Amino acid sequence: MANKQALRELQSRLAERLQVARTQARGQSWLAVECSGRGFLLPLREAGEIFALAPILPVPHSHRWFAGVANLRGHLHGVVDLAGFLGVKATSASHEPAGREQSRLVGFNQTLDINCTLMVDRLSGLRSEEEVTADADDGVQRPAFVGVRYRDAAGRPWQELKLSELASDEAFLKIVG
C-alpha cells in the first residue's frame, strides 16, 4: 500500500515538473524512461499524457511489439511495447499488468496526431541539457527516430528517441505482422 502511495506521489511530482518544464523556454529537456534496463529520453515537447498500465486488448495478426489497444480516458489508443519495438526486450517480460506495477503508458503529444502510447517499464524523472553530455557520434547508420546518445553524471547512457520521427516511421506504423 505504501508503495502505491509513493508511486502516486512520484507521478504527481513528475506531472508538476513536466508542466513547469514545458512552459520554460530553456534548452532541451526530456522525460527519462527505462525499458529492459536501458535508458531512453523522450523530448518533452513531443511527449503527451502518462497513464498507468491499463488492460490491453490484443490485436490479431499484429507484430509482437504491438501489445494491442487500451481504453484511456474513453479513447482507444494503440499500445506499443517500446522495448519490443526497439529489439531490446527481455524475454521474460509480458504485457500483463501483474508484475509490472511501475510500467506506464506514455502518450504522444496531440500535435503529432497519432493515437498511440509507448509502454515503458518505468519512469525515471526528467532530464535537461545541463544534466547530460552528448556522446561522440560513432557514424553508425540508425533510423531517423534515434537521436543523440547522452551520458548522465553517473556515466549511465541515455538514448534520445525523437517521437515526431517515430510517429511517421514506416516500420512503427505497420503493426500488421
What label would you give each PLM region?
Residues M1-G177:
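An acidic, low-aromatic, low-complexity terminal/linker signal
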